[in-house]
């Protein structure tokens, strides 16, 4: 599944994305974010992070720099003290 998702994202970047003007409000772009998230965390967790990112990518969100979190950042987020 991981390999298929990476191929799909790369296809989107090469064949579909150039047909439309740039609209992503974030850096890195949502497709680059998804590619990195899936490569780093695997298909399930990477897809979850990508979906969260895509839900934020809309005209009412200010956007900006939003990198893929490190694995240590993910652990801190789930800590309950």
Curated annotation (Swiss-Prot):
Q: Which GO terms describe its cellular component?
A: plasma membrane
Protein origin, superkingdom: Bacteria
* Principal subcellular localization: membrane
Q: Which SMART domains match?
A: Haemolytic
Extract the Pfam families matched here.
Answer: YidD
Q: Where does the secretion signal sit in this chain?
A: none
Q: Which UniProt keywords are listed?
A: Cell membrane, Membrane
Q: What does this gene product do?
A: Could be involved in insertion of integral membrane proteins into the membrane.
Which HAMAP family does this UniProt record tie to the protein?
Answer: UPF0161_YidD
Question: What is the protein name stated in its UniProt record?
Answer: Putative membrane protein insertion efficiency factor 1
Name its species.
Bacillus licheniformis (strain ATCC 14580 / DSM 13 / JCM 2505 / CCUG 7422 / NBRC 12200 / NCIMB 9375 / NCTC 10341 / NRRL NRS-1264 / Gibson 46)
Q: What is the lineage of its organism?
A: Bacteria, Bacillati, Bacillota, Bacilli, Bacillales
């Amino acid at each position: 599944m991981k390999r298929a998702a990476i191929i799909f994202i790369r296809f989107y970047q090469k064949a579909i994305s150039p047909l439309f003007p740039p609209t992503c409000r974030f850096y890195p772009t949502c497709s680059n974010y998804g590619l990195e998230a899936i490569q780093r965390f695997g298909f399930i967790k990477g897809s979850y992070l990508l979906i969260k990112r895509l839900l934020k990518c809309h005209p009412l969100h200010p956007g900006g720099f939003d990198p893929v979190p490190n694995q240590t950042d993910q652990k801190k987020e789930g800590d309950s003290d």
